[in-house]
Every structure is written in C-alpha cells, then in structure tokens.
Amino acid sequence: MYGIEYTTILIFLTSITLLNYILKSITRIMDYIIYRFLLMVVILATIINAQNYGVNLPITGSMDTAYANSTQSEPFLTSTLCLYYPVEASNEIADTEWKDTLSQLFLTKGWPTGSVYFKEYADIAAFSVEPQLYCDYNLVLMKYDSTQKLDMSELADLILNEWLCNPMDITLYYYQQTDEANKWISMGSSCNVKVCPLNTQTLGIGCLITNPDTFETVATTEKLVITDVVDGVNHKLNVTTATCTIRNCKKLGPRENVAVIQVGGANILDITADPTTTPQTERMMRINWKKWWQCFYTVVDYVNQIIQTVSKRSRSLNSSAFYYRV
C-alpha cells in the first residue's frame, strides 16, 4: 500500500518536473524568436530609407492642413504633384528634355525631383473618361476653346467633385432626380440628350413619349454633359447611345486635391455659383495665353500659391473607377 502511494507521488513529481522543463524550453524558444525578429527589424530599419509617394496606392484619412507657400517648405518632400496638360503643349514645345527642365524649375520652389509627374491627355473627352488623379495634389491645365466651352465647364464640375454613379437603362425605365446633388452624366464622342417630363399618369408634359422629336433638347454634339432637370418628376430620356453613355450620379462633395487652370480665353469658367457646390471655394484659375512655355513658367512660379487652394486628400485615387462605381 505504501509502495503504491510512493509510486503515485513519484509519478506526480516527475510530471511536474517534466512540465516545468517543457515550459522553460518553450519560453527560451519564444525569447529566441522574438529577439531575432527585433534584431532583424533594427538592422533593416538602419539600412532602408524608403519613401512612399502614394502613386497607385490608396489614400484614406481626414483632410490635411494646407502647406505654407515657401520655397523651403519641407512637407513637399513627402508630397506628389501631378500636372495634366493637353497633347498640343508637348507638340508645340517639341523638346525631348522639356520635362526635365520643368522638374529642375519646380525644384527651386521646393518640389524635389521625382515628386512632380507630367500627365498628357489627348482631349477633353478622353480625359473625362479616365482622369486618374493619382497624386496628392493635381493641377489640370485646360486651354480655352470656344467650341468646347460647355464640355470644359462640365469637365471641371466632374473632376472638382466626387460622384457616385449607376448605369441607366433608358430604353426600359423612366428616371427622376431626387435632389440638387442628383445629376445625369453623359460622355462620349458625340452626345445628344433629349428629355420628356411626365405627369403622374406617365403622359408627356409638352411632349409625346413615343416621339423623341417632341422631346426637349438639353445637349447637342457634346462630349460631356451633366444634365439637371426638375427634381421629383419622372422623365423619358433619348440619348445617342451609339456614341454616348449616360449614368445616374450623386454628387458626394468636393474633390479637394484638384485645381483647374484655364489657359487663355476671354470668358472665365466658374462653377462655384452652382448651388450644389459646397463649400463654394474657388479652385479654378485662369492664366493668359501666350505660348505653352510661358504657361508652364507661370504655373511653376505660382505653384505654391495654387496649392493653398486645395487640400492633400482624396477618397479615391482612380477617379474614373470611382465614377463608374455601381
């Protein structure tokens, strides 16, 4: 009997000793792994000095403070600037080194080499389809053209604001706009847009829903159309779908890291009077037209003042993807 008790006690003590040994071994192994990991982190931190310019990476968070207008301002070292210009600018300059020249000039204003990106676009229609406003700050140069002033004004409204859009099937359904922030956006090589307001019996008001020729014309041969109709009223739409797409969109608010610079023109585009533009902050500027070199020199000279009108933020880097979000 005493032998059985001694054996039980011995087994119990042996188990405790073995468990204690195992726990100590696990502790030593974990300490080894943790210390090695921390050592590697310290070593890598001393030899790696990477900078994230944010290109092709999502930017989220609250609005940052506007930077001071100074050629010695160090915050620009961690910011990127995209300058969008029409293809005719590079064609006129005809210099393979012109971007390098501008980069060196931007350096004198506190923008390091490699922080300024030059983005070329063919025309307003192509740019409106896929703006790709990737940088922390985005400046869009648009040369004034009296034949495209409506497209220019609506392009400014498109890129200076953020929109949530859904596709529309105008062959099957009637549509109505719920409030002032609700617009119908059409874009393509040639957009003709006609509307027919309907009463509560779905009969046309001043038009016949079966005859598009009686519809009210709101746009003719435009590349970009932002249509605003009477809220709360159903409409039958007629759009040249072969050369144009239309979407039902909601203006979410200002895209605060974008500024539009109008180049030349006697008339000045201004969308701040739009009641849906809140806050009504002027982020559209105009510079006199001479030659494209002169325009770029002006932008470089006043870049830090222009940056004061915008903020380093954006809900979506790829504005076209955000625009087509369904």
From Swiss-Prot:
PTM remark: N-glycosylated.
Domain of life: Viruses
Signal peptide: 1-50
GO molecular function: metal ion binding
Disulfide bonds: C82-C135, C165-C249, C191-C244, C196-C207
Residues linked to a glycan: N69, N238, N318
Coiled coil feature spans: none
Gene3D superfamilies: Glycoprotein VP7, domain 1, Rotavirus outer-layer protein VP7, domain 2
rRNA-binding recorded as keyword: no
Predominant location: virion
Gene Ontology CC terms, in alphabetical order: host cell endoplasmic reticulum lumen; T=13 icosahedral viral capsid; viral outer capsid
UniProt region (CNP motif), positions on chain: 165-167
UniProt similarity note: Belongs to the rotavirus VP7 family.
Role played: Calcium-binding protein that interacts with rotavirus cell receptors once the initial attachment by VP4 has been achieved. Rotavirus attachment and entry into the host cell probably involves multiple sequential contacts between the outer capsid proteins VP4 and VP7, and the cell receptors. Following entry into the host cell, low intracellular or intravesicular Ca(2+) concentration probably causes the calcium-stabilized VP7 trimers to dissociate from the virion. This step is probably necessary for the membrane-disrupting entry step and the release of VP4, which is locked onto the virion by VP7.
Protein name per its UniProtKB record: Outer capsid glycoprotein VP7
